[in-house]
Each structure stands twice: as C-alpha cells, then as structure tokens.
Amino acid sequence: MNRLSTKLVVAIGIGSALYGILGLWGFSIAPNTFIKPALAILTVFGALFGPVAGLLIGLIGHTVTDTIAGWGIWWGWVISSGIIGFTMGFIQKRVGFSVKNGTYNKGDISYLAITGLIGIVIAIIFAGAFDIIVMGEPFDKIVIQVLGATIADVIVFLVLGLPITIGLAKSNKKHTHLKIEK
C-alpha cells in the first residue's frame, strides 16, 4: 500500500483549510447555488499534488464549509467536490508536466481544461442525482441548482483556476531567454 508523504499530508491539510474557509464566500446565482472562487483551490492543488490530494481536499474542505456554515453536510455536494479535485489532479500525472518545475506545453493546458470541464460536469450531475435520489429533493429545484452550479464552476475554473495554475507554472520556469553578455 502506498503511504502518503508528510509533504502530501501537509498540502492536503492546507488545501482543505483554504478550500473549507474560502468556500464560505460566494455570489448567489440560483437557489442554494453560488459562484465560489474557492474552486480555484482544487485546480491549483490538484495540479500541484495530484488526484489523491485533489480528492481529499475537495472532500475534507467541503465538509469543513458545510459544518462551519451550519446548514448540515450535503454529502452529494461534498463528494462532488472530491470528484472535481480528483479530476483536476489528473494533469499532475502527465509525463513532462510540473507546476513546481514550470514544465508544461499547450497539450498539457488543453488536457487540464478538458479533464477539469469533464470532471465538473460529472461531479455536479452526481450531486444533483444524489440530492434527488437520497435526499428527496424536488427535481425542478435540482435542475436549476445543477445548471447554476455547472455554469458557476466552469466560470471559476476558466477565469481563476486555469490561469492561476498556468501563472504558477510560468513563474517556476527554470530557464530564461536572457543572455549573459561577456
């Protein structure tokens, strides 16, 4: 069995705390549905530390948000955050990609964009289905929430998560185009 390194455990703890606290803030766009900039944390930490870290940060962080907010833990949405974090972490497994070393190409960015978008859609549909089947929520309400949450998460991913991750990778490049003059 693979053990989690101390570095990975610390990253999961920090990421979960950030995602959990930042998840308390957002802009309402539908019933119980918000644009939450915290989603960018899942993108960045997933890209830095991989799918397991992304999964655990999503699960733990969302549980923290729901607990602090006092509205009860909505497990379908907690699991959906884990799914999103997990899919954001797929990029870290690509050969040649490293945010830490600043190594990436256009194909890597496209891969992150595609896996991120697919992960968001799958996760939100899962959360909606869970709410209807397990929680007994009305179908009409959930359709609005699923559409709103999907749009909100895609916006945050494309406007914050992806650009921040690319920016971090660019800032960590090990080479420069500057030339040493003799």
Swiss-Prot record:
The protein here is known as UPF0397 protein BT9727_2423
Transmembrane annotation, as ranges: 9-29, 40-60, 71-91, 114-134, 142-162
Cellular-component GO terms for this entry? plasma membrane
The organism is Bacillus thuringiensis subsp. konkukian (strain 97-27)
> Where is it localised?
Cell membrane
Membrane topology, as annotated: Multi-pass membrane protein
Superkingdom of this protein's organism: Bacteria
Any idea which UniProt keywords this protein has?
Cell membrane, Membrane, Transmembrane, Transmembrane helix
InterPro entries the UniProt entry points to: ECF_substrate-spec-like, UPF0397
Write out the similarity annotation: Belongs to the UPF0397 family.
Pfam families in the cross-refs? ECF-ribofla_trS (PF07155)
